[in-house]
């Protein structure tokens, strides 16, 4: 057995490392002595849990003063002890639990269903205390950031940076060091064991800081994370043949545009700002913008303006860049990261923004072009299934109506009136302007932003905003009330008890934060109802105000209608209704694809 010592907050702590089967007796005694609660963590070969090459190397358990590290990479005898230990623990504390639970499930068959009820996730606690990332004035939510805040900046710097140090020493990258470092390298073992000691200490500091008003959110957010981890695990079936064909087509098209840029305009590389700037200036374009290093600036805004003015080189460059980006970041990535069963796996972060809106990586559903079917066509339903989508009807505007109690807005929804036309008529502008103004109230933005978005003058934009306030006075009252609350307290609190910090210089954002946070909770409450009704195995993506599912073809219409019924919610006087839609085999069929 290896024994490592380290000092934390004036305490000498111990990391014990199992080397042989004989060492397991000491580990078992440690588990027996701490059955009520232990911090748990894993060390793996990387982050791609569902790839064929992914492995779990170490599993570690710890208190605030002692940790045990088990080298599961060495085989079944060690894995079995870990399996027994995890089964015996009444409570487990983890940082970013979804990742480690999926590791234990995928690598050792320890099903998450039996683990989640016993889990306390320090990352969830941290986000309930302060949802802001470090860059936005919060203390952050990574373990390194939490160590810096609640234990010591030196500890965060020294121990959590060990792997970066080892990568540099071994002349490799931080991404590769996890799989290549010797299993018993003392600094690797110290890093692993200390993670659980740090997590246990961070948990002790965080728990009393969760505001009383937010306490009920602790089990609620754990349930949301649990459901999302099951969606992650399930994966979304990829049509590999179509995806490869699309990637090849986009590459060929990109090369054609690049060839035209070279032969017609002498631009060798459209992705080279200098080459492109040279070509544009030879056409008579004056580039006034400069980068921080003094070079000519050719950014998206300039290209958009030039394309609008009919500049062919700008259009060619824009198209080539777009095809390259879409191919690499979307389609080729789907192909490269799919698992052995041709599934791509999401990694859903249910508490990402300061308003708690979800984010998704793996399948970047939230960043795909809103009406495009070509990329979505890559994903298909299970054999014998079809794709279905259920989205909310004007979710955020209905939430705004419910929160504000504005009679005009409520009656508009009750009577099926056109809210966008009402705003437009009040300001004597086209419906498009009224629609943009309505959504700006949801997302925030002043007259200048409205003017730029729809191409009107600032005086007209101000008139539209004034017309909105006059038409929906309840919204204006709510906005002022929330801004005052934010100015007084530095935060507002939504109906679920979630504290939302608001910067003192941006108290006008309080309404936007309240709407986004409340809308997110409408979707999350729906996820819980769907889970309780047994629909989770069929769910593929939660996308803000929409749920995408793979449903048996023979039951799809009925099931989609039932999902829609479960998702809808009565918020006071306003029904936040849903629109179920059933497509064909591919996700893209819901956007116009013929398959």
Curated annotation (Swiss-Prot):
Domain called 3'-5' exonuclease: residue spans: 1-212
Region described as Polymerase: spans on this chain: 213-595
Superkingdom assignment: Viruses
Family matches, as SUPFAM superfamilies: DNA/RNA polymerases, Ribonuclease H-like
Pfam families, A to Z: DNA_pol_A, DNA_pol_A_exo1
SMART domains: 35EXOc, POLAc
Keywords, ordered alphabetically: DNA replication, DNA-binding, DNA-directed DNA polymerase, Exonuclease, Hydrolase, Nuclease, Nucleotidyltransferase, Transferase, Viral DNA replication
UniProt cross-references to PROSITE patterns, sorted A to Z: DNA_POLYMERASE_A (PS00447)
A Gene Ontology BP annotation from the UniProt entry: double-strand break repair
Catalytically driven reaction(s): DNA(n) + a 2'-deoxyribonucleoside 5'-triphosphate = DNA(n+1) + diphosphate
MF-aspect GO terms: 3'-5' exonuclease activity; DNA binding; DNA-directed DNA polymerase activity
InterPro entries registered for this protein in UniProt: 3'-5'_exonuclease_dom, DNA-dir_DNA_pol_A_CS, DNA-dir_DNA_pol_A_palm_dom, DNA/RNA_pol_sf, DNA_polymerase_A, RNaseH-like_sf, RNaseH_sf
EC number(s) per entry: 2.7.7.7, 3.1.11.-
Role description: Replicates viral genomic DNA. This polymerase possesses two enzymatic activities: DNA synthesis (polymerase) and an exonucleolytic activity that degrades single-stranded DNA in the 3'-5' direction.
Family: Belongs to the DNA polymerase type-A family.
PANTHER family in the record: DNA POLYMERASE I, DNA POLYMERASE NU
Protein name, UniProt field: DNA polymerase
Protein's organism: Mycobacterium phage L5
